[in-house]
Amino acid sequence: MIEVFLFGIVLGLIPVTLAGLFVTAYLQYRRGDQSDL
């Protein structure tokens, strides 16, 4: 049952990782769009 447990963890981490990357890219885009240094 350890394989099922690890599979559940991976399925739970994938959306969180994608959401984190999306938020980071969005914040960098907003920061670059607001201040033109």
From Swiss-Prot:
GO CC terms, sorted: chloroplast thylakoid membrane; cytochrome b6f complex
One function term, GO molecular function aspect: electron transporter, transferring electrons within cytochrome b6/f complex of photosystem II activity
Keyword terms of this UniProt record: Chloroplast, Electron transport, Membrane, Photosynthesis, Plastid, Thylakoid, Transmembrane, Transmembrane helix, Transport
One Pfam short name: PetG
Record GO biological process: cytochrome complex assembly; photosynthesis
Record keyword Electron transport present: yes
InterPro entries per UniProt: Cyt_6/f_cplx_su5, Cyt_6/f_cplx_su5_sf
Compartments reported by the entry: Plastid, Chloroplast thylakoid membrane
Presence of keyword Plastid: yes
Main location: plastid
Membrane topology: Single-pass membrane protein
TM segment ranges: 5-25
Superkingdom assignment: Eukaryota
Complexes and interactors: The 4 large subunits of the cytochrome b6-f complex are cytochrome b6, subunit IV (17 kDa polypeptide, PetD), cytochrome f and the Rieske protein, while the 4 small subunits are PetG, PetL, PetM and PetN. The complex functions as a dimer.
Function: Component of the cytochrome b6-f complex, which mediates electron transfer between photosystem II (PSII) and photosystem I (PSI), cyclic electron flow around PSI, and state transitions. PetG is required for either the stability or assembly of the cytochrome b6-f complex.
UniProt similarity note: Belongs to the PetG family.
Annotated protein name in UniProt: Cytochrome b6-f complex subunit 5
